[in-house]
Amino acid sequence: MFVLHDVAFLVEDKAIPLSDRSRTGEVNPLRRNLASAITKGAEQAGRMKQQIVEDHGLRLRDGTWLDLADVREIHSVVTSLDDMPGIATASAKLVGAGLLPPDNIPWTVSLNDLDLIAQLVDRPAEFLLYVRRRTEPRATEMFMAVDELDLFLLVFRMGLYVEPDPEVASREMPWLGKPRTADVRRFKEQVPGLVTSHTDDLDAWYYSLHPPAGLEVDDVAPKPRMVPSPLAHSSTGSMRTRASDG
């Protein structure tokens, strides 16, 4: 578990035991092994999350009490040394099959991808934004991808944003008033899409840092970075202006 201010990340690292049929490359047995590891990790993280929510803390092995009363946001993360192609990014299918609860969708990622994402992130807020968007139930339905890094780089470019259901938002936040026609239209116009490759810039940057043996690279390619929103850019600029004015 990692706690930063009022956000907690519950991390379950799973070794994936592959059956003999999976080791031969059969797709269906392999997918079942991967799905089983993900659901088991999600169940373990879910139990800890429930305990934190109910008790506002955890009893550690040495008997001491870890106070987590200030934690307001909890995310489950299931990692593995093994690659999880086609399963790690298919949360919606696991939810639809009843293998994952829709209210506790973990972020499922291989340690290799997690290491690359850690290198790409410039600010903690970028990482938190990605985990929030990545585990949003409707986002797992609207954005279908094979590669985790394609989803991550899509956040850098477009935000991986899904319009919320205005009817649900109105019920949960009545002060917003009745749903506007434009909000309902935008919500209904959303359609699922396949996320294609977004890793060209990442590949160029990574291979310029780690060229194959015997090759030399003159310049390091630019690292992919999150495109700042106009509002954030404007706010940063105004703060810098005030700072320069004393």
Regions found by a protein language model. Give the residues of each.
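Short low-complexity stretches enriched in small and charged residues
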Residues: 4-6, 31-36, 137
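Catalytic cores of nucleic-acid endonucleases
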Residues: 15-66, 71, 76
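Structural beta-sheet core signal
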Residues: 10, 76-78
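Active-site beta-strand-loop-beta-strand hairpin of nuclease catalytic cores
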Residues: 3-10, 14-20
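Short conserved micro-motifs at the rims of enzyme active sites and ligand-binding pockets
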Residues: 12, 22-23, 87-92
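Short glycine-biased active-site loop of nucleotidyltransferases that positions the nucleotide triphosphate
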Residues: 1-2, 68
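Composition-driven low-complexity segments enriched in polar/acidic and proline residues
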Residues: 74, 81-246
